[in-house]
């Protein structure tokens, strides 16, 4: 059963400006500890695109849940990692998922300066009603 679909587009220059003003604060606000470890290992040239993709991904996932960031789910409730082939893998904290049956989240990310886009689809093998 389809639970929801979400998409988000982020202007990378917008994230660059935020990073210039608040270099560490912004990353710590939206990234989980696992994501921060990846972020630190990147060269600074990749920081804005990395953050833009994570921001867009988390917005898209929250929209697919039908709630939006700050409306029942927060940035740190969602972790975006990559498998060995680079495919994005989404983990959602148990604080949020305890309310739901088992589900799968499919996420696609793309960036082509100056924009990045995220598209999320959430499905379940059970009938679920959100809201």
UniProtKB/Swiss-Prot annotation:
Keywords: Cytoplasm, Fatty acid biosynthesis, Fatty acid metabolism, Lipid biosynthesis, Lipid metabolism, Magnesium, Metal-binding, Transferase. One of its GO terms (biological process) is fatty acid biosynthetic process. It is an enzyme of class 2 (transferase). Its cofactor is Mg(2+). It is found in: Cytoplasm. One of its GO terms (cellular component) is cytoplasm. GO terms for molecular function: holo-[acyl-carrier-protein] synthase activity; magnesium ion binding. It catalyses: apo-[ACP] + CoA = holo-[ACP] + adenosine 3',5'-bisphosphate + H(+). Its EC number is 2.7.8.7. Mg(2+) binds at residues 8, 59. HAMAP family: AcpS. Belongs to the P-Pant transferase superfamily. AcpS family. Transfers the 4'-phosphopantetheine moiety from coenzyme A to a Ser of acyl-carrier-protein. NCBIfam families: acpS (TIGR00516), pantethn_trn (TIGR00556). This is Holo-[acyl-carrier-protein] synthase. The lineage of its organism: Bacteria, Pseudomonadati, Pseudomonadota, Alphaproteobacteria, Rickettsiales. The gene is acpS.
């Amino acid at each position: 059963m389809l639970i929801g679909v979400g998409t988000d587009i982020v202007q990378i220059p917008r994230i660059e400006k935020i990073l210039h003003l608040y270099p560490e604060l912004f990353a710590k606000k939206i990234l989980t500890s696992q994501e921060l470890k990846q972020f630190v290992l990147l060269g600074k040239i990749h920081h804005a695109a990395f953050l833009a993709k994570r921001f867009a991904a988390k917005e898209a996932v929250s929209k697919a849940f039908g709630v939006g960031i700050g409306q029942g789910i927060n940035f740190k409730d969602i972790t975006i990692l990559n498998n060995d082939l680079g495919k994005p893998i989404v983990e959602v904290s148990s604080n949020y998922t305890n309310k739901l049956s088992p589900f799968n989240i499919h996420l696609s990310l793309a960036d082509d300066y100056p924009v990045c886009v995220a598209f999320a689809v959430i499905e379940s093998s059970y009938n679920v009603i959100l809201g």
